[in-house]
Amino acid sequence: MVRLTDSEKAEVVSLWSKVDEKIIGSEALGRLLVIYPWTRRFFEHFGDLSTADAILKNPRVQAHGEKVLSSFGEGLNHLDNLRGTFAQLSELHCDELHVDPENFRLLGNILVVVLARHYGKEFTLEVQAACQKFVAGMANALAHKYH
């Protein structure tokens, strides 16, 4: 389990207060689908995913990216109980969707890249370290039912 210090929690919460979940979520999920094309199999019903441009402009990818990032935002309200908070979502991804839990780690790492790209100078080493711990905690919580 990943534990953030009070300082790390403050860093992530402060950055997140500036995050536009639609923009950041859409880009993060889009990048996941482009960079790791095997992840597209979970989204085939979203329509055209044939090119990077098609993926990044796909309204269903954008909407789901926003939904995913909203869940990450919800995680900030439950940093001390991510596993409990996301138990049902973990179960869904494990038992029904059969998502490879490694995909959660990949998405988290892409999210950190997207945040760095959008928040530049504000994305200090301390903020990055805190964000990496946060996304690792989220990935761990979402993969919990697989263990």
From Swiss-Prot:
Heme b binds at residues 64, 93. One of its GO terms (biological process) is hydrogen peroxide catabolic process. InterPro entries: Globin, Globin-like_sf, Globin/Proto, Hemoglobin_b, Hemoglobin_oxygen_transport. Red blood cells. Keywords: Heme, Iron, Metal-binding, Oxygen transport, Transport. PROSITE patterns: GLOBIN (PS01033). Gene3D superfamilies: Globins. Residues 3-147 form the Globin domain. One of its GO terms (molecular function) is heme binding. GO terms for cellular component: blood microparticle; haptoglobin-hemoglobin complex; hemoglobin complex. Heterotetramer of two delta chains and two alpha chains. Belongs to the globin family. This is Hemoglobin subunit deltaH. The lineage of its organism: Eukaryota, Metazoa, Chordata, Craniata, Vertebrata.
